[in-house]
Curated annotation (Swiss-Prot):
Source organism superkingdom: Bacteria
Keyword terms, alphabetized: Aminoacyl-tRNA synthetase, ATP-binding, Cytoplasm, Ligase, Nucleotide-binding, Protein biosynthesis
Top enzyme class: ligase
Name assigned to this protein: Leucine--tRNA ligase
Length: 840
């Protein structure tokens, strides 16, 4: 029996695909739009750690689907590249003392080698790298288009600054934790700092970003997260005049029906009104309070669980309808970045207001109740009800009616207006780091911004050995004086760089025309391929990359450069591949190499105390990262591909278990060993024909809907039937090789060549069709016995009569093996049940 030499086989076919450019795709105008397919992976950033087994999951899914569609006559575009600018690459360079240009190139080469070893059908001629000047030239150009459209501006503003990373971070890059705000990258402490920043007006597109979600085939959870992040609120903006001042406090509310329950106003600690309106004898306390609150995170300030704090300004506003005086407070739970940075305190009908009023002994006035009568409140009443304690024309009405009447009164008397607000903030687009796209802006002697011309692009990132970030907020580029100052012109360059998200905002478009020096992509090619039909990647990019790229795409659509309103038609989030880890009694996870197994129990080597096995994310610190290179060496790329898809539904998280891949490896060996049987052109038995069509049907339907695990299961069941036959029937084996090929392309190519066909299978075959009429319906399991002892089980149609049962049993390989040199006394066949052969 010849050994399944997977290493040799996989190397052979990877070289064949490379040398023959098997997966290179060109635009063919004769192929109709409905037969074109653009499949995309979220491209990787090339970290020094290389791939772990979690990374190939999404890539394998797109590869299987792309190959399947290719075999079904589709013109498939499936490109790959590298998101190579940004913090991860720069941090690695700083840690190792290697320039990011050098380390990034080295890491890309490592990634490419690993990706190619998995046998993915990428068109490598379309490879892109976001740090390549021929790529970022167009990132800079798109920025200038945003600038010309008035969507990019510079301003001094409070921003999240991370001293450890040495840069400003966008709101989306901050994680709010009970211990304060942290950077998403590295989980470092961050602080608020006033710096001049470039900002993109993503808020101008808030409504369209929200509404167009309805057109997308995306997971509902992702759409809901984007809706919440955009945070649309419809309500009314009310003007409150301030006693002794010309200024007004503008308050946005979605509950104008509670306006008569206002007993105080609260403004944010960041409000510029504080200095103007605070009475002298209150200033000391106010300034102390404001300084203290600046250090807190938004989450901590607004959390219902946290104690509400505030301070009185000594000033009053007037109620817009009753003209009553209302005290003006400063409160921690009001954010300057949301709405107008002020709220009306209605403690009877808002829980935060209720807590605040209780703490500072402020009046609580209910104006809505369930019964229409005054009731004692233990907490804020937030339900619908009947209005009470309100002026006559607003009293004793449903609160929905009060809402309409209040809005009408405010508009009529010019005390307010209907308004829509969003939680979404403009995108802070500059970073004080070296390894990023230089922003193509000059400043004249007066500080006015002057955009570069298209002919001046790319503005190249200057080479420097001193690329480490400062801890003061200045960019490393500011230290390169001969680059910053344009000789004899009086102009200086912008020294901030773009964030790591810039290059990924539009990369799917550059794949369409990656070597075009005149434009980011020709309109003809954009119209040929767009939109992306299937996009697979992690859910962690929901409010970062996915939102940003939608924004840029809509701008390009408005400018007439792209033909679709949305970039990604269908999105799938693959689940996380986790790993086993070990947890001590106190909940602390310990590295896997500190654990020993005794009698199916696990113990910490250091103290010999029992630990429990748990599922955790793969991490270097826990020593539970699985390197795909090791798995490929031991079991092969086809094994890892099939195992990752067989572990469970694509969208589920599931733990890696190397023991599980052994079963997949056995499955591939079973297929390989079919070569040992006679390859027969005889007509196959109808039972195996039926089983084949059943398998084709299942694999076709499940691959189409990305249910890869059940498609693999169907192939495993079929192979178990196939190996029962003495011969390997060509008319059965050939179509099976084709349905196997998207999942195990190397093995399939080798078997395709073995049966005498011309490689590549992916260019010289088509997906087999199934015939419903040939699929056994209402099948029954038939037990095959010799002298009453079971030797095998087979599935047969309920219509199979006794004589056919006998004939099939006598042709069964396991039965035949047991009948050698034996005398058959009689054969007993019972329809839909068994065949028993009596021998002596």
């Amino acid at each position: 029996m010849s050994k399944y030499e997977f290493i040799k086989i996989e190397k052979k076919w990877q070289e064949f695909w490379d040398n023959n450019k098997t997966y290179k795709v060109k635009e063919d105008p004769n192929i109709p739009k409905e037969k074109r397919l653009y499949i995309l992976d979220m491209f990787p950033y090339p970290s020094a750690n290389g791939l772990h087994v979690g990374h190939p999951e999404g890539y394998t899914a797109t590869d299987i689907f792309g190959r399947y569609k290719l075999l079904n006559g589709f013109h498939v575009l499936h490109p790959i590249g590298f998101d190579s600018f940004g913090l991860p690459a720069e941090n690695y360079a700083i840690q190792t003392g290697t320039h990011p240009q050098k380390s990034t190139e080295e890491n890309i080469n490592k990634f490419k080698k690993q990706i190619k070893a998995l046998g993915f059908a990428y068109d490598w001629d379309r490879e892109i790298r976001t740090h390549d000047e021929n790529y970022y030239k167009w990132t800079q150009w798109i920025f200038l288009e945003l600038y010309k459209k008035g969507l990019a501006y510079a301003k001094e503003m409070p921003v999240w600054y991370c001293p450890e990373l040495g840069t400003v971070l966008a709101n989306e890059e901050i994680i709010q934790t009970p211990d304060g705000p942290k950077s998403e990258r590295g989980f470092h402490n961050v602080e608020k700092k006033y710096l001049r920043q470039w900002v993109l007006k993503i808020t101008k597109y808030a409504e369209r970003l929200l509404n167009d979600l309805e057109e997308l085939e995306w997971p509902e959870s992702v759409k809901e997260m984007q809706r919440n992040w955009i945070g649309k609120s419809t309500g009314v903006e009310i003007d409150f005049e301030i006693e002794g001042h010309n200024d007004k406090i503008k308050v946005f509310t979605t509950r104008p029906d509670t306006i008569f329950g206002i007993t105080y106003l609260v403004i944010a600690p960041e409000s510029k009104l504080i200095e103007k309106i605070t009475k002298n004898n209150f200033k000391r306390n106010v300034l102390k309070y404001v300084k203290h609150e600046e250090l807190k995170s938004d989450l901590k300030r607004t959390s219902l669980e946290k104690d509400k704090s505030g301070v009185f300004t000594g000033s009053y506003a007037f109620h817009p309808i009753t003209n009553e005086k209302i005290p003006i407070w400063i409160g921690s739970y009001v954010l300057g970045t949301y709405g107008s940075g002020a709220v009306m305190g209605v403690p009877a009908h808002d829980e935060r207001d209720f807590q605040f009023a209780k703490k500072y002994k402020l009046k609580i006035l209910p104006v809505i109740s369930k019964s229409g009568k005054n009731e004692i409140l233990e907490k804020a009443f937030i339900d619908d009800g009947i209005s009470i304690n309100s002026p006559n024309e607003f009293n004793n009405l449903k609160n929905s009616e009060v809402k309409d009447k209040v809005i009408e009164w405010l508009i009529k008397n010019k005390k307010g207006k209907e308004k829509v607000t969003y939680k979404l903030r403009d995108w802070i687009f500059s970073r004080q780091r070296y390894w990023g796209e230089p922003i193509p802006i000059l400043f004249d002697k007066l500080g006015n911004a002057v955009p570069l011309e298209k002919n001046d692009l790319p503005l190249k990132l200057p080479k420097t050995a001193n690329y480490k970030p400062s801890r003061t907020g200045e960019s490393p580029l500011s230290r390169i004086k001969d680059w910053v100052n344009l000789k004899d012109t009086g102009f200086t360059r912008e020294t901030n760089t773009m964030p790591q998200w810039a290059g990924s905002c539009w990369y799917y478009l550059r794949y369409l025309d990656p070597k075009n020096p005149k434009e980011f992509a020709s309109k003809k090619k954009i119209e040929y391929w767009m939109p992306v039909d299937l996009y697979i990647g992690g859910a962690e990019h929901t409010v970062l990359h996915l939102l940003y790229s939608r924004f840029w795409h809509k701008v390009l659509y408005d400018l007439g450069y792209v033909n679709t309103k949305e970039p990604f038609k269908k999105l799938i989030n693959q689940g996380i591949i986790t790993a086993f880890s070990y947890q001590k009694e106190n909940g602390i996870l310990i590295p896997n190499d500190q654990v020993i197994e005794k009698n199916s129990k696990f113990f910490d080597k250091r103290d010999n105390k029992e630990v429990i096995q748990v599922i955790a994310k793969m991490s270097k610190s826990l020593k539970n990262v699985i390197n795909p290179d090791d798995i490929i060496k031991e079991f092969g790329a086809d094994s890892i591909r099939i195992y990752e898809m067989f572990m469970g539904p694509l969208t589920d998280s599931k733990p890696w278990n190397t023991k599980g891949i052994i079963g997949v490896f056995r499955f591939l060996n079973k297929i390989w060993n079919l070569r040992e049987k006679e390859l027969s052109k005889d007509n196959p038995p109808k039972e195996i024909i039926s089983q084949l069509h059943k398998a084709i049907k299942k694999v076709t339907e499940d691959t189409e809907k990305l249910s890869f695990n059940t498609a693999i299961s169907a192939m495993m069941i079929f192979v178990n039937e196939l190996i029962k036959y003495e011969k390997n029937y060509l008319n059965i084996f050939k179509p099976f090789i084709i349905i196997l090929s998207p999942y195990a392309p190397h093995l399939a190519e080798e078997l395709w060549e073995y049966i005498g066909e011309t490689p590549s299978l992916f260019k010289n075959s088509k997906w087999p069709e199934f015939d419903e009429n040939l699929i056994i319906k209402d099948a029954k399991e038939i037990v095959l016995q010799i002298n009453g002892k079971m030797k095998d089980k087979i599935l047969l149609s309920k219509e199979t009569d006794e004589e056919e049962l006998k004939e099939i049993a006598m042709g069964n390989s396991k039965i035949k093996a047991n009948l050698l040199n034996k005398k058959i006394v009689k054969i007993i066949a019972i329809k839909n049940k068994l065949v028993n052969i009596v021998i002596k």
